[in-house]
Each structure stands twice: as C-alpha cells, then as structure tokens.
Swiss-Prot record:
Activity across pH: Optimum pH is 7.6.
Positions contributing to substrate binding: 658
Name of the protein this chain belongs to: Endo-alpha-N-acetylgalactosaminidase
Keyword Cytoplasm: no
Short sequence motif LPXTG sorting signal: positions: 1735-1739
Signal sequence range: 1-39
Cellular-component GO terms for this entry: extracellular region
Classification via NCBIfam families: endo_SpGH101, YSIRK_signal
C-alpha cells in the first residue's frame, strides 16, 4: 500500500449532513484536514478531479443540518419529561401496561399525530446550581446551525471549580452504560481551551473524564483509592473554529472508548474494578469548561432544536453553467429490446438513456479522464463496438513522472433494462508480483477512479426530478437517508453514498458499484457511490458516479495477494413504476436495484434463522461443550416446533472466548476438540441449526502461536497498542501486515480441520480501527477470505461489513451500544435488503427514534447458554416468540412499498428531536403473496403507536399484541407439505382473540398444541365456525396450530456423550435403572428453567444407574456431574468398569458457583433454589478394561430430608495422573501439574472474587518467549513448568477468594495432616495469599479482610529470584470434614514500579500463577512443624529494618526452635511456634525517615487527589502534584512536625514517568527547635527519574520544613511541581558488628583439646555457630554463650561447669537441660496500634505485611538444619 496514502492530507471537502446533536454524521468531509492516521481508512481520495467537480468539493460548505427535505426539530417538547435517565425495557413495558387502554380508532387508517404548538427557543444546556462551578450559556446561530455557547468565567478554574453544564435527561442509563454524542465547535483562543465530558460524576474528585487541553485529548478517572490519567501519545486538540463530532461510551463493565470525527482518541480503557464499583451508582453526565489565569474555554454545542434556523447556502438566483458542446463528439448507441444508451466513442461515457420513450441523462458534459493513484491521466482510447448491445474501450494509461504504464479495457453493455460498466482487463507494464516485494510502490495501480463521469443523472428541467441516497447511520435518532429535490436553484451536493437513486415522474434509476470506497469513518464509510450536482446551461444535474476503486495495494512494499484484486464494475438499472402504485420514485428504483446488486454470501439462509443465540465457553471452564450444545439445539427444535436456529459459538477455540486469538484452527480440547465439533456440525443440520464461530482479526494474546513482534501494532511513541485485558493482556495487531503475510492461510487451516458444514464466521471487534484500516476495502477483503471457505460473514458492529455481512451483533443484541451505535438506520437500505441481513434497528423503546417500534421488527437476541450470564431459558423462548418470529416472517418477503407518517417529537437519552415513523409497509414474495404492515397510530404518546396490524393477502395475521401467523417452511427453509403447514400463535396479553383462517384451512376441525421444551403438548381439537376460530390462551406462551393431529419427533439425546440425556432434557428418567424409593427421584427445573435431577426426602439410599456406551477399551476417562447438595447426606458418583469401581462423594455443598457462563451459577435468574446455586462438578477418573460392554455410571444419594440436585453428566478421555501418579480416583499423593486438566481448574473451583463473572483465572498455555519473563518487560512467567500453568490475571486488592478446593475434589480428612506444596509466580508482594478454611467461605464485609481464614501472604517472586518460588504449608483436616485450601486476593495494592495501563497489565504486577500443586498426607510430627516454621521465619530474621532489641529476641527464639530434638512432640512444637509468632508480631521497625504520621500538618498547592501526603506514603506510583492548571512554581510546600525530630538530609524522588513538575532548582528551609533557619539550595537537577539528594552535613532537630521548587521541568517549563517521594533521612546509629574475638579465642583454645567428646562438642558448637551465622540468627548473647561454653571444656571425664553468663535457651549437643530463659521481650516492647502499609525504608510499622512476606518466601529457599547429637 502506498505510504503516501497513509500520510495524505485532504485536498478538498464536501458538505456534511446530519440531524440533531449526537448524530452519526450523515456525510462528512471525505478526508479531514489532518494527516490520515493509521486508524483511518485508506481509500477514497479524490484529489485531482475534473476542475468543476474539484472546485465544488473544495468549496462546499460544512453544514451539519440534514437540509434536504429533512424535518427540523420542533420547539415543542411534548413528550414526557425524562428526569432519571433512560429506563430499562422492562420498566418501559411495565409503564406501558399501566396506562389506561385507549379506544382504538374506528377508521381503518392510522390515527394521526396531534398538532404541536411551537414554543420559545430556550437553552438545552444549563449551568449547574453550585455557584462556584457555574459558567455562562448563550444561544447563537451560525451558518444555518443553532448552538448553545458554553463559556467558563474568571471565577472558574481547571480543578475544583470548573464551569459545569448539564442537559435534562442526559444521564447514565439504568444498566449503568453512559453514551455521549456531541457536535461542537471550539471557539476558544488557540491553545487555551480545556473542554471535556464528565461521566458518572459525583464531584470533581470522583468521576471519569474525557476531554482535552492544549496538549491534546486524554482520559482520566478519580476515586478515593485510585486516580490516574492517560500518559500516552495524545491526539491533537481541536483547532479553533473546527467542527467536531465527539462520541464517548462507558459501558457498565468499565470499558471506556471515545472518538472525535471518527478518529479513536485512545485504545479501549478498562476502569479498575475499585473505581467502577465506587462510581457505579453515579448517574450524572456533565460538560466541563476550565479556566486558567486569563485563559477561558468557549465551546459551542449544537442543539437538538434546529427549527426556524435560517439556511444560507441555497442560491437565491437561478444558476447557470457552461452549455454542452458536442461539436467534436462522436456518439454511438448500444441497446437491448427495452433500453437504449447513447455513448461517447472517445470515452466510456453514457450521454443519455431511453426506456419506453422516456429519457434520463447520463454524463451530459464531455469527460475524458481517468485517475490512477489519484493522478489525472487523459488516456489514449481505441473504441470498438462489439455488437448491438456492447462496446469496448482500450485505454493506454501513461504518466512517466508517476511511474504509471498500463492498459485498461472498459466494456459498456446494455442488458435488458441495465447498463453494465465493466473494466474487463488491466495490464500493468511494471513488474508486479502479488505477495512479493516491490521496489517502488508508485509502480502499483493502487486506485482507479472515473469520478466526474456520471453513470446516470437527473435534470432540474425534468418533472419530479429527485435524488435519494443512503449513508450509514447507527444512531436511532438519525436516519441515514437523504431525499433531495433537484431544482434550480439548489444547494451544492457532493457526497458519498451506499445507495443512490435518481428519478423523474416517468423513470427511476439505481446504480450499483463494487467500489469499496471510504470517504472517512461513520457515515462516510461504505461510500460506493458519489452524488454530485453539476450546473449545465440553465439546468442543475445531479449525477451518480461510482466512487474510486482499489486495485493493486501493498504493505511496506509487500504486494497484497492476488485475491485482493477485484476488477472495477458498476451497473445502472432503469425502471418505470415497479410496485404498481401509479407513481415513480426511489422505491421503484430500489426494487429494480435488487436485480443488479451484490448479494452477500449466505443471504438466502437469513430468513429461516429464527432462533439465534450464543453458546459460551470461557476461562477453561468448558461450560457448554460441543455435544451439550447439540442437546440445546434439540431442545429448541422441540420448543419452537422446528424453527431454524443460529448458534454462535463464542469460545470454540483455545481455552474459550477471548483466548488464543488468531489461531483459528486451535479447536478447544476441553470442550470436545475437533471430533466433537465435527459431530456437532453434522448432527445440527437435521435441525436447521446454522453454526458459527467467534474469531478476532484485530488483536492477539501471548499464548497464540501467531503472536509475534512483527504482527503487533505500535503507537507513535514505539509502545505496543494494547487491546482487551481479561484473561491476558491482548495487543492489537497491524491488520495490513497480517493481510500481506498470510492471514488467508489461517482460515484455510481451520477449513482443513473442520471440513464442510460450518455456516458462518463472526469477526469480533473489527470495524473500530484498533488494528488499523478497518474500512470498506479492508473489510471486503476479509469477508472474501471467509467466503472463499464457504462461510457466511458476520460482524460485531452495526456499521461493519455493510457490503458482505448478514449478521451484526450490536444490531441484534438490543442491550448493546446505546442509541448511537445500533443497527443500520436507513429506510432505503432496509427497503432493499430487509430479507438479506439481520442488521437493522430493533424494538428497544428507550433508545427512541427508529428503535421505538419499527414496523418490520428487527432481531432481538437473547441467550440461555451463558453469554453475558444469560441462562434464563424461559426468557429466551418468550423473547423469541415476542420479537423474532414476526421479524423472520417478514424476511420471507421483499419490501415493495414504504409509507412514512407525520414527524413526531421524541425525548430520550438527553435529546429532544423529530422522528418520522414509517406507517405502512408492503411486502411481496415470489408467489405474489402480499403482506401489509400498518402502525395503528401516528401519535407517539398513544399506546397504539407501538401496535401494528399485519395482513396476508387481506387477512389479518397480527393485531396488536397477538398474532396467528402461517409458517410454511421447515427449519432449513424448504416448503412444508400441506399436512405439515402450521400457524404460530402468541399473545403478550391474556384474553380471547378471534381469527379468520385461510380458505384451505376452513374445515371443521383444527388442532392446537402448547409448545414446551418437550415439544407439542396439551393437544386441543378446535372447531372452525364460519371460517374462524377463537383462542383464549395464556399470555407469553407459544402455541402452534395444525390442520391435522401431529406428533413430536423422536429425540436421541446426548449423542456421542456416552450416556443418554446428560442434561435431563428428555423429561423422563425411564432410561435410568433406579434402586431405592424411585418416587424421590424426579426432574425439576431451576430458577433459570434448567432441568435437573432432584433426590429429596428419601428414607433409604436412592441410586440411578445407566450404562456408559461407546467407550474404548483400556482407555483413561474422566466423568463429572454437576451437583448442588443442600443436604448433609452423601451424594455420590460411581463408575463400575466391571473390573474396578471408583466413587467420589460430597456432603453438603459449600462453594457457591460464580462462573458466569455456567447455566447453574448463583445469579438469581440462574439459581438452583432460594436464589443461590452451589452447583460444582464432581469427578470420577477411571480406566476401562478390555471389556467395555457393561461399564455403568451411578448417581446416588443416601437417606436425608433435604434436596440434592444433579445435572450435566459428561464423560470424555483424559490422561491425567493425579492420584499417586495413577489416573483413577483413589488414595495417594495428589499431584496436579495442570498439563492434563479435564475441565475447569481442578481441584480448585472459582471463588467470589469477582462475583458472578467471566472468571479471570484460566489455564495458561506456554508460548516462549512471549508468555515468559523478559519479553516486553514481563516480570513473571505465565507458565512455570511444562506447557500449562494456572493463571489469575489482575485480581488484586479484592479482599476475596480467588479459588479454593472443595471436598469432592480433594478431601482433607478429619484429624489428618497434609503437606501442601506448590510453585508460584506473583508480580507484587502480598497481593495474594495461601489460605486454609473450612465450611462455606465468608468474605469480609464492607471491603474488610475475611476473618475465618488461616492466611499466609505470598511475596513477589521476581525481585530476588530468577524463577518461580516454592511454597509449603501443613494443613490438618477439621473434624467437620470440610477443610479446603485456596488462593485469596488480599487488600494489598500491587506495586507496578511506575508502569501503568497496558504495560502494568502485561508485565504481570497484578497476576498470580500456580503450578505443580502437591497434597501429601503425612503423619504429623513435632519435627515437621518445626521445619515448616523455620522455613517461614528465617526470611524474617534476615531483615534489617527492625530494632536490634526486638529482632534479637526473635532470632534467639528461632535458633532455639532450630535446635529442637527430632522427637519433639507436636504439642511442644506448637507451643514453641506460638512463642515465636508472638515475638514476630512484636517486632519494631527502625525509624529511617520521616513519615506522614510524624507531621502535624502538610500544606502545599495540589491537584485534587494528589496532595503532599502522597510524597510520604512509600508508593512510587502516587504523586504530589500541583494543580494541572499550572502556575504553582515558586509556591512553598510547608511541613510542620508534631515534635522536633532529628534529620540529616533530603532525598527527592521524581515521578517514574513523564517530566511535568520534576524539580530543577529548589530552596529548602529547615527550622530547628530553637527557631533557627537552615537554608539549602540545589540547582540544575537533571530531568530524569533518578533520586536527588541534599546532604545537610549535620543533624538538625527540625520542627518545620519548607520546600520550594523555583524552576521545574515539563510541558512549557516552570508550570508545576511534583514528587513521588520526599524522604527526609533520620540519623542512623550504625549497628556495631558482633565482637567475635572472645569466641574465636575460646575456639582456638578448645580446638587444642584432645578428648574425643570434647572434639565432638567443639565441632557441634562450630556447626551451630555457622548455622546461626548463615541464617542471620547470631546475637551478642549467643556469641558470649558459645565462647563461655567453649572456655569451660577440659580434657577430663567430668562435664564442664555451668557457664557463668546468663544465656538464652540453646540446646547444644552437650547441654541436656535449659540453663537460662529467653527474655520476654513482648512485655518490654509495645507494638504500634496501627500497622500502616508503608515502605519499610520510611520506618513505618507494617508487621503483618512485611513479616508474612518474609516468612512465606522462605518456603522457596533451601534450609540447612544442624542436627545435634545428644549427650
């Protein structure tokens, strides 16, 4: 791709059209005035056009009004007030039902809208009530647009008192989503504007902000615990006077996105959970205008109300232009039987069309130029007429200056009523080889354009002359359609369109082009056509041109593959009245257009896919394995009586959704692998289920084998462009690089794996530009790659893939995106393609506009297999029949007529606007059956506005809330036989309805069935009377009507799953052999309507047994069943292979299920009973023998009153060896290396750290070097050993359980002791802890730490180790039998070492990895306890930040423990350890520096949340920073101490990144206790993040300190002051090294002794001395004791006398009893009451944190224990 295309500046602009504030602009400048960013589309430049067109484009005024016959927003805001923000759909429906019933109009025609009374124009934006935050608001009009001008004033600032403005109704919605769309102009003086939007605003210290200052756009969030802002490269701030279209979305899950003029302002930001939780109840959305000194912000925001604004761009006088001069033109004609075209022999130009005596112009003025690579060329043309219908033009294209040397053949051909314009051959005489490097990209024919050569036109001289065109709009308030009368005079027109039509009162014409052009993003994408007004003589002509085509393109010199090229083609179709309504308009052209348009691959299936949904797998949990999804297909087939289905498999690959992206052929093994997936594909066909998969072509994760440095996208500053961060931190890719380097091969690999049968590929994310060019051309190439494999193309966004896609998720999932980002809002587009796509605005009333009851419906997508936590089966079915059946019914027809009503005023989402509703739509099918859909009222305030009547061939099939609609197609769209034809009945309200049946149904009897998950039930024979039937049935319950009696198809449940009916969907237990009281075993439904087996109230054991089929001999298997046991009675799963029996059981379930995509999670809508779910899988691992004919599985429950629930049985091959190195469930040492995990994170289950969520813990796969330490600054290994480890991403500071074992996975038996060891990686100290608990976990309340746990915090593993560390703990099973172990997220914050954003996420500071878990039963001894304790305590005694007195006591006690006898009892060991724990808790830290608590006051100018105390918190990532508004250099920071304290100097620690506020010159004044001032200065400190020191050269007993930065670094210099830390050092008395001279002398003397016993004693003392020295245990008293002891050794038979010195409690080999006591230091040392979490260097107490950090780290160190010999 030519590099110049990336950097090209706009050379022209065109008029823009939009409707209302927050609009998706319906047309815009083709390119902006700035260089095209990498995010921008890279096609569509039309520099160097013919002079008149270029001039028009260059001089067309920017006008944000949708001027051409678009209704203006009325001043009457007659809709109900919106005060609390948009309501949920459920609330709106409830309100609607509460309204009194309105009497239906007696006339057949719809009720008219009520007339509106104009009102005075008032400001739509108001300043806030708080006086200090008030600005000014004025109304102004400019160039035909009304604005509210918002200004800050002198009383405002840019921190706590900015000018704030609010708009009635603009709030965060009921679901927690915020959407803001503004069109504004910055009227401030250049570089002085500080404007933006506050979201979820509580006050200026608690909010989310998106805005700009002179340095550009940025985001920021603030909360009491976490505040930060964007520090990356910024998008430039708007130019003064420029028009800006700002779009911001903040989703409830914390994802923040923003764009201005369709340019992304930053990559997706995900708010920290703490911030999101803190602000979740805040609803305010405000605009901010800041002031600083004399700089004011002035911004004009376009208003909704544009009524009465005068436009100034329509010429007052008739226009004239050059006359046509054909004196040198030679014309010819080509014609079919119906259409004649007059063509120019010198150039492929059509002068005029004739059809049945009526004419339409083409390009009336002579034109003879082609634009190659945006260079104007006049070709040498050879004309050849092939036959009556066809002519050819051979063009020689030469431009030596631009290396263009090519030939091109263009063919004009008339076919029936069509004109085809085709480039049939292109020869580039430069050497170009697809896939190879080219030396100069100018040699490519990158783009080809015939702009200026209108394919068809209409003249103002013709009666009824009009142009009608469609652009992309996804804003429900704003139609993308333009309807323009072609008159003289008229406004200029030069604009891109997706669809375009010209018409007179006689003829209409439409144009299709395969141009994949983008004139920009938003409404300017997919602009395949260009409409242009040209004045010729005394007439105005509006012509439709094909936009530019793309041909040969490259990426950094690598030519794109051959398949990316597509020969340019365009077609014109001309028609008379096509819909027999006795008039000609665009609708006739649109009907004819279907005969020339492209048809997206797979479009014929769309109408029959009625039951779309997502089956979700995530985070290694395999919630919906492939073959279980097959059972879901069968269940829906029964419940819908055979409607077609579409199942999108999110998480088909790797470890589930958003794992392993780009490796498309990596089929998820834990959900069944390739074999099960192929089985699903094959078996689903029978039920008309179309399967698709979710992929990502925009970002990748380190685990993927396609993750490599070359494909990754970088920001301008060289940093990586980060994407989604959930299981792993993703990085965006460069899509152009990917295309040039073999992306196609990945699709081909997938096809090879799966073969045929997969229906569609859903491309996630693509379209938001995060991988670069995602515009029309790039998207079409991607779709071609997918189509080439035989797959249908689907996409995420409503605007994405308009040319090729048949399914758009954000259009279909109505809760997504907000009102500005929904389906396509264009009546023209929907008219043309309603039957081909699920891309439309659906019925979601709170969005308003087109979403308030569209007549043709629109897909409404729900789910019951885990996506978004949706597992409400009944809700899914109800929604399907309430919304989707009729939507799909209409798609079996094509639209033939569309009638709009009178504009109505709507108010929602903070906007008041006009909307023109469609009132009547006609549709026909191939058999000429006619459907008419009519809205009952044009009055938006009437309930009948939201009701329709539908007739089929004049017979009513829907009336308001009820329909009885014929359905004559099977699940695959084939016509049903007459006896199988049916009608679906559904009514959202109860009550009787009467229906006229078609004549061929009007027999005496018909048969009605209630539809349930068991199929057709409760048969009713109904009598037909006078051709009518009356139905009085349940509300929201589907029924089906047949002519004759019907039966249900036989279902073979759970094919390939080795058991019949794994999910109890059959409704019967007859396939089980039941022992015990069978009546106590029954199938019941959960709160989410999920079928379960329940055993309850049994007086004896109840067992259900079934054979496992299809097993392989001598093969290892795993089987699990979900179980929720509310009883203390044992519930078991047992497998008997005929040779061996394995059993696993659980007593009362103790762990709630927090797995969001699991149908049995503990959300109320999915709960088992009582609004909770304790469902967890219970496993049995077994190995088959040689005979597999009689392998049985048994589910059983012992006697008990309470209930036990079972569901989802799954059996599959598994090669784990966890039990004593054997596979089968059994005794022995348990080992889990995570290399062969069956499913989930066995033996752990997910804890409540995130609530019910898509868990951020998963099995991480190794991809060296990218998942390992070192790459991109990564601090820890994601995979510790082998290919897999268990990874938790980013769950720090949660004070909750990450994961835990449960007894059914590993049982810590009562009274038995186990050694638990594992290797781990942790990115920060003490953020995660190993915990031991029993019973149900009880989390701490209100953010406090859980109290019922034995907790061992774990230190980081990378600052002092080159590999993972090992932890060892002893666990004794409680008598209750419900002990468990797990990993806990503490309340401690991570330390990101100055990194932030994606870097902090990627590098692992917030992560925890586990591997090589081992649980070994041991016979507990005192020695084990002492050895384990020593591992925990030795790191603590090595620390140097505690006082000598407190540490010596601990050292001596630890040494005593190290010398304990091997046979020390358990009780004695525990007693000794308790003493040590008390001494450890009593440690006192040294005071090395002043801390915040030492000061009586800290006073300094500061930005909110960035006060001076931050410089004393020990956290390098928090800052003291003066006001961001600047101006605080030279202002003092004053620190007053509580009492005079000795200090010796200052260490200034600058911020870790950036320069703003870094001190350059400083003045430091220290006032001592006598009042004397000591002044120090420093100058020219360098601008870096290294510490800077001022050494006082003396000790000062300070009472007050004043620090002033007189010169600083940063933006502009001398604006701010900042510091990460201010460390005022305290004098330290150096600890005197231990005096060993006495010991050495005694040792020298003792070494001369000759008695063997003495020699052994000396050796023992030496060993003990070495052990104490090596392990930092030596104290003065110990040295003194050792010396005294040695001095008393003599060569004699007598024992030495007792030493004269009082000694600690040592146990040396020659000492049999205690001869001294360890002093009770705990009585002497008072522990501070509040152990703050502060850096040790500051001297602040932090006992638990620091000591656990040290003690646990020893578990990863080698221990050298001296074994002393007894006397």
């Amino acid at each position: 791709m030519n590099k110049g295309l990336f950097e090209k500046r706009c050379k022209y602009s065109i008029r823009k059209f939009s409707l209302g504030v927050a609009s998706v602009m319906i047309g815009a400048t083709f390119f902006g005035t700035s260089p095209v960013l990498a995010d921008s589309v890279q096609s569509g430049s039309t520099a160097n056009l013919p002079a008149d067109l270029a001039t028009a484009l260059a001089t067309a005024k920017e006008n944000d009004g949708h001027d051409f016959e678009a209704p203006k927003v009325g001043e009457d805001q007659g809709s109900p007030e919106v005060t609390d923000g948009p309501k949920t759909e459920e609330e709106l429906l409830a309100l609607e039902k509460e309204k009194p019933a309105e009497e239906k109009p007696k006339e057949d025609k719809p009720a008219a809208a009520k007339p509106e009374t104009p009102k005075t124009v008032t400001p739509e934006w108001q300043t806030v009530e708080k006086k200090e935050q008030q600005g000014t608001v004025t109304i102004r009009e400019e160039k035909g647009v009304r604005y509210n001008q918002l200004s800050s004033t002198a009383q405002n600032d840019n921190a706590g008192k900015p000018a704030l403005f609010e708009k009635k109704g603009l709030t965060v919605d009921a679901n927690g989503n915020a959407t803001v769309d503004l069109t504004f102009k910055d009227d401030s003086e250049k570089g002085k504007s500080r404007f933006g939007v506050f979201l979820k605003f509580k006050d200026t210290k608690n909010n989310v902000f998106v805005g700009y200052d002179k340095d550009g756009w940025f985001w920021e969030y603030k909360s009491p615990t976490t505040s930060t802002w964007y520090r990356g490269s910024r998008v430039a701030a708007p130019e003064t006077g420029s028009t800006n279209r700002l779009s911001i979305t903040l989703k409830s899950d914390g994802q923040l996105n923003a764009s201005n003029n369709d340019v992304n302002l930053f990559d997706t930001v995900t708010l920290p959970a703490a911030v999101n939780d803190h602000l979740k109840n805040e609803k305010k959305i405000l605009l901010k205008a800041g002031s600083y000194d004399d700089e004011r912000t002035v911004v004009s925001v376009k208003t909704d109300n544009q009524e009465g604004v005068k436009t100034e761009d329509t010429p007052a006088e008739k226009e004239t232009g050059p006359e046509v001069d054909d004196s040198k033109v030679t014309y010819d004609t080509i014609q079919s039987k119906v259409l004649k075209a007059v063509i120019d022999q010198a150039f492929p130009r059509v002068k005029e069309y004739s059809l049945n005596g009526h004419t339409l112009p083409g390009q009336v003025q002579q034109f003879n130029q082609v634009f190659i690579n945006n260079h104007r060329i006049t070709p040498e043309v050879t004309y050849k007429k092939i036959n009556e219908t066809t002519a050819e033009y051979l063009m020689k294209l030469r431009d030596d200056a631009h290396l263009i040397n090519a030939e091109m053949t263009v063919r004009l051909q008339v076919v029936d009523n069509q004109l085809h314009f085709d480039v049939t051959k292109i020869v580039n005489h430069n050497q170009v080889t697809p896939g190879q490097k080219i030396d100069d990209e100018r040699k490519l024919l990158s783009s080809i354009s015939f702009l200026g050569n209108a394919l068809v036109s209409v003249s103002s001289d013709q009666t009824g002359a009009k142009f009608d065109g469609a652009t992309m709009s996804n804003n429900t308030h704003v139609s993308g359609d333009d309807h323009i009368d072609v008159t003289n005079p008229m406004k200029d027109l030069a604009k891109g369109y997706m669809y375009g039509f010209v018409s007179t009162d006689k003829l209409a014409a439409g144009v299709w082009s395969n141009s994949q052009n983008s004139y920009g993003g938003g409404s300017n994408d997919w602009t395949r056509l260009t409409a242009y007004k040209e004045t010729v003589g005394n007439a105005n002509y509006v012509g439709i041109h094909s936009s530019e085509w793309q041909w040969e393109k490259a990426y950094k010199g690598i030519v794109f593959p051959e398949y990316t090229k597509e020969l340019p083609s365009a077609k014109v179709v001309i028609t008379e009245d096509a819909n027999a309504d006795k008039k000609v308009d665009w609708q006739d052209g649109a009907i004819a257009y279907r005969s020339i348009m492209n048809n997206p691959q797979g479009w014929k299936k769309v109408k029959d896919i009625t039951a779309y949904r997502i089956a979700m797998n995530f985070g290694s949990q395999a919630q919906n394995p492939f073959l279980m999804t097959l059972d879901g297909i069968k269940k829906i087939n029964l419940h819908t009586d055979g409607l077609g289905q579409g199942v999108l498999l999110k998480g088909y690959g790797s470890e589930g959704h958003d794992s392993g992206h780009l490796n498309y052929a990596d089929i998820g093994k834990r959900i069944g692998g390739v074999e099960d997936f192929k089985t699903l594909i094959e078996k689903a066909k029978k039920y008309g289920a179309h399967l698709g998969i979710h992929v990502n072509a925009s970002e990748t994760y380190p685990e993927s084998k396609y993750f490599n440095e070359k494909i990754l996208r970088k920001n301008p500053d060289g940093s990586y462009s980060y994407g989604w961060n959930w299981l792993d931190q993703g990085i965006n890719i460069d899509a152009a690089y990917d295309l040039a380097h073999g992306r196609l091969a990945r699709w081909e690999d997938l096809k090879k794996k799966l073969g045929d049968g997969l229906d569609f590929i859903y491309v996630d994310v693509w379209g938001n530009g995060q991988s670069g060019d995602n515009g029309a051309w790039a998207t079409h190439v991607l779709a071609k790659e997918i189509n080439k494999q035989g797959w249908r193309f689907a996409i995420e966004w409503g605007h994405g893939g308009e040319y090729d896609s048949t399914f758009h998720h954000w259009a279909a999932d109505l809760t997504y995106g907000g009102y500005t980002n929904k389906g396509i809002n264009s009546a023209i587009t929907r008219f043309i393609r309603n039957h081909q796509k699920d891309a439309w605005v659906g019925d979601y009333r709170s969005y308003g506009g087109a979403a308030n009851y569209p007549l043709l419906g629109g897909y409404s997508m729900k789910d019951f297999e885990g996506w978004q936590g949706r597992s409400d089966y009944n809700g899914y079915v109800t929604n399907l029949f309430a919304h989707d059946v009729m939507t799909k019914y209409f798609q079996h027809f094509t639209v033939s007529k569309w009638e709009n009503g009178t504009p109505v005023t709507m108010t929602d989402n903070g906007s008041t606007y006009k909307w023109t509703p469609e009132m009547r739509v006609e549709l026909v099918d191939a058999d000429n059956n006619k459907v008419v859909v009519t809205r009952k009222s044009n009055d938006v305030n009437s309930p009948q506005y939201r009701e329709r009547t539908v007739t089929l061939n004049g017979r009513v099939i829907q009336d308001g809330s009820a329909y009885l609609t014929p359905w004559n197609w099977d699940a695959n769209g084939k016509k049903l036989s007459t006896d199988k034809e049916k009608m679906y009945y559904f009514n959202t309200q109860a009550g009787a309805t009467t229906w006229t049946l078609p004549s061929d149904w009007a027999k005496s009897k018909v048969y009605l069935y209630k539809l349930t998950d068991q199929g057709k039930t409760e048969e009713q024979e109904l009598t037909v009377k006078d051709g009518k039937i009356t139905l009085d049935l349940l509300a929201n319950q589907p029924y089906v009507l047949y002519r004759s009696k019907q039966t249900n198809p036989e279902m073979s449940w759970s094919e390939g799953m080795h058991i019949y009916d794994q999910g109890f969907n059959s409704g019967t237990l007859k396939h089980w052999t039941i022992s015990g009281d069978a009546s106590k075993a029954e199938i019941v439904k959960s709160q989410g309507a999920n079928d379960m087996l329940r055993i309850q109230g049994n007086k004896e054991k109840v067992s259900l047994t079934q054979k496992l089929t299809g097993l392989k001999p001598n093969t290892k298997y795993a089987v699990y069943v979900g179980v929720d046991n509310r009883s203390n009675a044992k519930a078991s799963i047992t497998v008997n292979t005929g040779e061996k029996e394995v059993t696993t059981y659980t007593n009362k379930s103790l762990a709630l299920n927090y797995v969001k995509a699991y149908a049995h999670n503990t959300r109320r809508n999915n709960a088992t009973v009582d609004d909770t779910s304790y469902f967890q899988n219970m496993y049995a691992f077994f190995t088959t023998g040689s005979d597999v004919s009689n392998v049985t599985l048994t589910l059983s429950r012992e006697a008990g009153d309470e209930a036990t629930y079972f569901d989802e049985i799954r059996t599959f091959e598994n090669n784990s060896s966890m039990y004593g190195d054997k596979h089968d469930t059994g005794k022995g040492t348990f080992k889990q290396d995570f290399e062969n995990v069956a499913q989930g994170i066995f033996p752990f289950v997910v804890g409540g750290v995130e609530g019910v969520e898509d868990n951020r813990t998963h099995l991480s796969e190794k991809h060296d070097p990218y998942t390992q330490r070192g790459w991109n600054g990564k601090k820890v290994d994601d995979v510790i050993e082998g290919n897999w480890s268990l990874k938790t991403n980013g769950l720090v500071s949660r004070r909750n359980l990450v994961y835990q074992t449960i007894p059914q996975n590993f049982r810590f038996e009562a009274g038995k002791t186990y050694r638990v060891t594992f290797e781990y990686e942790a990115g920060s100290d003490n953020t995660y802890a190993f915990v031991v608990g029993k019973g149900e976990f009880q989390s701490g309340r209100r953010g406090t730490q859980a109290s019922n746990l034995e907790m061992h915090e774990l230190p980081n593993t990378w600052t002092d180790s080159k590999k993972a560390k090992k932890a060892t703990f002893l666990v004794t099973g409680a008598e209750t039998g419900d002990t468990w172990v797990g990993i806990y997220s503490t309340g401690n914050a991570s330390n990101t070492r100055g990194d932030s954003g994606g870097n902090a996420n990627f590098r692992g500071y917030n992560d925890f990895m586990m591997d090589n878990l081992q649980i070994e039963e041991i016979t507990l001894t005192g020695k084990m306890l002492t050895e384990n304790a020593l591992k925990n305590y030795l790191p603590t005694v090595a620390m140097t930040n505690y006082t000598k007195e407190s540490m010596d006591a601990l050292k001596e006690a630890v040494f005593n423990l190290s010398q304990a006898d091997d046979d020390i009892s358990v009780e004695e060991a525990r007693a000794e350890i308790a003493k040590i724990e008390a001494l450890k808790n009593a440690l006192v830290q040294k005071k090395t520096a002043l801390v915040a608590d030492d000061f009586a006051s800290l006073t300094a100018p500061a930005q909110a949340q960035e006060g001076l105390a931050n410089a004393f918190d020990g956290n390098l990532s928090s800052l003291w920073h003066t006001s961001w508004g600047g101006g605080d250099v030279g202002k003092p920071a004053t620190m007053v101490l509580k009492e005079a304290t000795e200090i010796t100097g200052l260490r200034y620690v600058p911020r870790g990144s950036g320069s703003n506020g870094n001190l350059r010159d400083v003045k430091l004044v220290v006032t001592d206790e006598s009042g004397k001032e000591h002044t120090f200065t420093a100058t020219d400190w360098p601008d870096n993040n290294k510490p800077k020191d001022i050494d006082f050269g003396k000790t000062i007993k300070a009472k007050k300190i004043v620090l002033t930065g007189t010169k600083t670094y940063g933006d502009g210099g001398d604006k701010y002051q900042s510091a990460a830390e201010l460390i005022f050092t305290r004098p330290q008395v150096a600890e005197t090294p231990l005096d060993l001279s006495g010991y050495e002398a005694a040792l020298a003397k003792a070494q001369k002794l000759t008695d063997k016993d003495n020699q052994e004693e000396v050796a023992s003392v030496q060993a003990s001395m070495k052990y104490a020295t090596d392990n930092h245990l030596l104290t003065e008293r110990m040295v003194e004791y050792f010396a005294d002891y040695l001095n008393q050794l003599k060569d004699s038979a007598t024992k030495p006398d007792a030493p004269t010195v009082e000694k600690p409690e040592f146990k040396l080999s020659s000492v049999a009893s205690d001869q001294g006591k360890t002093p009770d230091y705990k009585q002497e040392i008072a522990r501070p009451e509040t152990p703050e979490q502060i850096l040790p260097a500051t001297g602040e107490s932090q006992f638990d944190t620091a000591l656990f950090l040290a003690s646990v780290s020893l578990a990863l160190s080698a221990l050298f224990v001296v074994k002393t010999k007894k006397d």
